[in-house]
Amino acid sequence: MSKDDSIKKTVTIGLSTTIFFVLSCFASIPVGFNVSIETSAAFLAFIAVAFGPSVGFYVGLIGHIIKDFFLFGNVSWNWVLCSALIGFIYGLPYKIIDLKYQVFTKKKIVYFWLYQVACNFIIWGFFAPQSDLLIYGQPPKLVYLQSFLIVISNILAYSVVGIKLMTIYSCHYTKQATLMKINNS
């Protein structure tokens, strides 16, 4: 990785973490049982797909730490790790989807929608509740209800906000890439 790339990634992580935190605090809709529909979940998916798994990991990690600290006064480390992990996993197909140089087609939208559904079920539907049961000994019914609501709310947030963000970003950059190719010919 060149020096310019590492600087760009660092700046992207810093700015995206700030946006993640602001969205977590001010753009979430409570649905009950300490669960909210968070636009920050859709933003994390967008950032990870646009910039790759390492950026997704750090935005999920740092953003969730700051959010927990400011909103709750303490950090739930198992959930922070789940946010970091899902940010990383969301970013794995970033070269396949390639928002910057290829159109975000319906096929890619469906592919990533199914992919993020599977990721949400694995991370928030399995790992997060299991870690709550093992670490905190919380009541299983409450833990699984929360995890089910989180999975559904993340899927809804991505379906409404994430797809729009990715489509707008892709349209903007693919037009620029096409213009650059035309100008260089």
From Swiss-Prot:
- Name it: UPF0397 protein AYWB_013
**Any single Gene Ontology cellular-component annotation:** plasma membrane
Q: Which InterPro entries match?
A: ECF_substrate-spec-like, UPF0397
**Which segments of the protein form a coiled coil according to its record?**
none
Q: Which domain of life is it from?
A: Bacteria
Please verify whether the record's keywords include Membrane. Answer: yes
So where does this one cross the membrane? 13-33, 42-62, 69-89, 109-129, 148-168
Compartments it resides in: Cell membrane
